[in-house]
């Protein structure tokens, strides 16, 4: 597979924060973490989708919602905060994940149906027929909205969820392994910008010229590097997902 650098008008909102189907039970998250002068922030998440931005307060705000098996196992989701030297480390875990019951999820068009066991699913098939889109596993819908102080060096690692950046003032490094990165940037306030993927694409409508001097495109690897204005450094990487660079 060969990845492509694509310059396009990005007018379609991504579906990472829009979910079709009936409402599910969920638990709200609300946590704050103080940040001292000179500290940096490191975050590591597995399943959550993350929306991150900056604000003027000297603290980190972590909000969002958790739904695990329609609210039945929300208490398994934990946010962990540790400090090491000048670094604040934030991560999540799903406690006793191997013990959480799996569900059968069936998709019919835009409708999502969840069955607790095979007997329920087979009964549904008797009257509705078989579906080609069936998944078995824990039903998880976890979305985090995080605000960090402006101009604080921040690093995020996400495994399965997308990382969305509607606005960010300060040095930022994002690695979203499978979910991809969607960043909105004000070009004049961006210093060095680096975007990288292995099996996805890089899409942008920023005023940046793509040439052999600032881009490398090979089988299974695409890298773009540019200096757009004056400001902090941004690095966005998604080995298996897409990177979207939007003009703000």
Map each language-model feature to its residues.
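Right-handed parallel beta-helix
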Residues: 31-36, 79-171, 221-238, 242-248
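Bacterial Sec-dependent N-terminal signal peptides
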Residues: 1-29
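Short, surface-exposed interaction patches in beta-rich subdomains
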Residues: 28, 61-63, 71, 167, ...
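Short acidic/polar alpha-helix capping motifs at helix-coil junctions
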Residues: 2-3, 42, 155-158
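Residue-level detector of short, conserved catalytic/binding motifs and their immediate flanks
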Residues: 39, 172, 193
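Solvent-exposed coil/turn segments that connect beta secondary-structure elements
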Residues: 46, 55-58, 65-67, 84-86, ...
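Short linear S-[DN]-x-LW-Φ motif typified by the pepsin-like aspartic protease active-site region
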Residues: 26-84, 153, 165, 183-185, ...
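Internal hydrophobic scaffold segments of catalytic domains
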Residues: 67-104, 182-198
């Amino acid at each position: 597979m060969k990845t492509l650098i694509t310059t396009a008008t990005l007018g379609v909102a991504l579906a990472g924060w829009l979910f079709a189907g009936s409402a599910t039970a969920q638990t709200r998250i609300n946590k704050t973490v103080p940040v001292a002068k000179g500290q940096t922030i490191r975050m590591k998440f597995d399943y959550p989708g993350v929306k991150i931005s900056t604000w003027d307060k000297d603290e980190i705000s972590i909000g969002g919602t958790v739904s695990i098996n329609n609210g039945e196992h929300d208490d398994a989701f934990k946010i962990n905060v540790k400090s090491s030297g000048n670094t604040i480390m934030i991560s999540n875990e799903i406690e006793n994940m191997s013990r959480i019951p799996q569900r059968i999820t069936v998709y019919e068009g835009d409708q999502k149906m969840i069955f607790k066991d095979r007997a329920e699913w087979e009964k549904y098939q008797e009257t509705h027929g078989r579906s080609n889109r069936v998944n078995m596993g824990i039903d998880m819908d976890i979305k985090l909205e995080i605000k960090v102080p402006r101009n604080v060096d921040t690093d995020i690692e996400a495994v399965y969820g997308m990382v969305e950046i509607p606005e960010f003032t300060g040095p930022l490094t994002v690695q979203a392994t499978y979910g991809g990165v969607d960043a909105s940037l004000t070009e004049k306030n961006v210093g060095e910008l680096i975007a990288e993927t292995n099996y996805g694409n890089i899409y942008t409508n920023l005023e940046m010229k793509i040439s052999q001097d600032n881009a490398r495109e090979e089988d299974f690897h695409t890298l773009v590097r540019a200096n757009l204005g004056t400001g902090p450094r941004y690095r966005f990487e998604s080995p298996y997902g897409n990177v979207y660079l939007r003009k703000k």
